[in-house]
Every structure is written in C-alpha cells, then in structure tokens.
Amino acid sequence: MKKTKLFSLLASLIGAGMLFSAQAHAATTLTVYTALEADQIKAYQAAFQKANPDIEIKWVRDSTGIVTAKLLAEKANPQADVIWGLAATSLALLDKEGMLTPYAPHGLSAIDAKYRSAANPPAWVGMDVWASAICFNTVEAQKQGLPKPTSWADLTKPVYAGKIVMPNPASSGTGYLDVSAWLQMMGEEKGWAYMDALHKNIGQYTHSGSKPCKQAATGEFPIGIAFEYRAVKTKKEGAPIDVILPSEGLGWDIEATAIVKGTKNLEAAKKLADFSASKDAMALYEKNFAVVAVPGVAKPDALLPADYEKRLIKNDFTWASTNRDRILTEWSKRYESKSEKKQ
C-alpha cells in the first residue's frame, strides 16, 4: 500500500514538473502589425524565430494607410505588440499621439541617424528605404505609340490620357510618399496644379502600392507609378517593363520598427526590435532594397543607378506627418472619383 502511494506521489510530481516545464517554455505570441510586402514576410519571420524560438508571430498585414488607421482606431485599447515594417511618416504620427514605447535596440549605434527618430531613446528605428519608381510596359507602349516618360512632368502630357495607374495615398504609403514629395518639391500651389494635370491621365487609383506595377506588367495599364522594390522585382521576373526613376527626384519613406505602448509582452517586443536593427536583419532587407538603415550593407543593383540614394529628395518627415490628414482630405476631395472600389 505504501509503495502504491509512493508511486502515485512520484507520478504526480513528475507530471507536475513536466507541466511546469512545458509552461515555462511555452512560446510568447507577439501580435505584429505590418505593411511589409507579403513576399518578404516569410524570410523575415523565419530568421527572427530561428534566433528566438520561444517567440511566435501573429501577423496583421495591410497597406500602410489601412494599418495606420487601424492603429489609431485602437489607441484606447491597443491590439498590437510591435509594428515591424510601417512608414516612418505613419510612426511619427503615432508617436505624436503617444502610442509608442521608446526603445534603443542593440545595434542602434550602427543605424544612420537620418533613418531613425531623433529622440533618445528613439520611438522608431528604420529598416530600409523605399522610393518612387515608374513601371513602363515597353510592349504595350510600342503597340499604342506611347513615348517613354523620363520625368514627372512627362506624365501630364495628353498622349498618356487614361494610361496611368497610381496608388491612392490614403490607402498606400507609396501613394502618400509621391503626393508628399510633389508638394515638397514643387510647393503647395504648383504641387496641386501638377496633380490636377496628372489626374486627367489617371485611369485608376489603387489601394496597393504594388498593384500599379503589376498592372503595368500585364498590360492592363502601360504605366504604373509604384516603388523601386516592386519595379525591380517585377522586371527580374521577366515582365516587359522598364524601371524609370523620374529626373526631378524621388519621393521616399523609411520602413521602420516600433514597440506599441501598453504591450503586455514588452521583453519579447524588445527582442524583435533588437533583431530588426541587427546586421542579420539588414542583410535580409538588403535583398529587397537598395538602401538600408545601416550604411555599407546594401549592394549595387544592376537595374538601379549607382547614385540612386542621391536621387532621393530632401524629405521633411515632420512636415509630411503633421500635414497628412490635411493633404489626404484635399486629395480625396479632388481625385477620389477614380479610386478603385475597396474590397
């Protein structure tokens, strides 16, 4: 009888120990909001989880404008732990609303100062730069007798009427970096006049920054205003497009990482922020973008000019963030009629 009780006690202790061990090693789940391209996420997640096997990621992905609006709507009851891959202009807005937890990740000293928030510790830390590019379908252009544009000004020529597609800036970070750049480069009056002229040639405004290049690749529209990652990738996949970088300069933004204020998984969130700023992560970002937040990591791309980074405009992120609502309200009032229907 005593032996039976002893065995029962031992079994209970072993069972309890195994349960405790399982609980101790149970994975922490981070809810991560992102506007990263779907074809980038898998590699980023795999590398992070290889280094942090005790942390799982639950992704919430959409275009920049949608993710930003969702985060703002959840301000009183945040659902995200971390933001990994969202425009710096959006993160600056969230920071102004007091929605981010400042954190200095390991490796911060290697980050170029212009690719992180100015605060110490920073509210957000950059990953990579994405910038304007035009996807030009050479086959369709030849069929339709369309000359190759080389500048933003060229896109207002009557020959391109109905031939151009671009992202809606209220939905797409790519769309907003274009609109913001035109207003900064040309000034408000001339910038809106430019967009009025461009609007006459727009066939559709999409809710995705990648879609215009995809539409150009298939010939649905011969010209798509997109961004260099999608343009270069699409051409390398064999699409009959030329990648055009307009001569006046390129609008751009920074994909960045930030910790959401109020997260219940702060230590795990810090580990993700550490990884995002690491050399290993930069090596992943470099596979997709010509400019990353740590100088000297990115390698030249044969489809982009050697002076690519110098073609980026002098971008005032504070202005772009502070004036975002006003700009989008005015843009929607003028041009929303040509936007595709939301799914």
Task: Write out the residue ranges for each language-model feature.
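Periplasmic-binding protein-like
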Residues: A110-A113, V159-P167, Y194-H199, Y205-T206, E237-K261, S276-A298, ...
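Extracytoplasmic ligand-binding site segments that recognize negatively charged/polar headgroups
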Residues: A35, D39-K42, Q79-E220
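Sec/Tat signal peptide C-region and signal peptidase I cleavage site
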Residues: F20-A26
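An extracytoplasmic/periplasmic, membrane-proximal ligand-sensing/linker region
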Residues: E188-K190, V291-Q343
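A ligand-binding cleft/hinge motif common to bilobed small-molecule-binding domains
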Residues: T89-L93, A217, F221-P240, F289
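A bilobed periplasmic-binding-protein/Venus flytrap-type ligand-binding module shared by bacterial periplasmic
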Residues: C135-E140, S180-L183, D253-N265, L284-Y285
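Early extracytoplasmic/lumenal segment of secretory-pathway proteins
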Residues: A27-L93
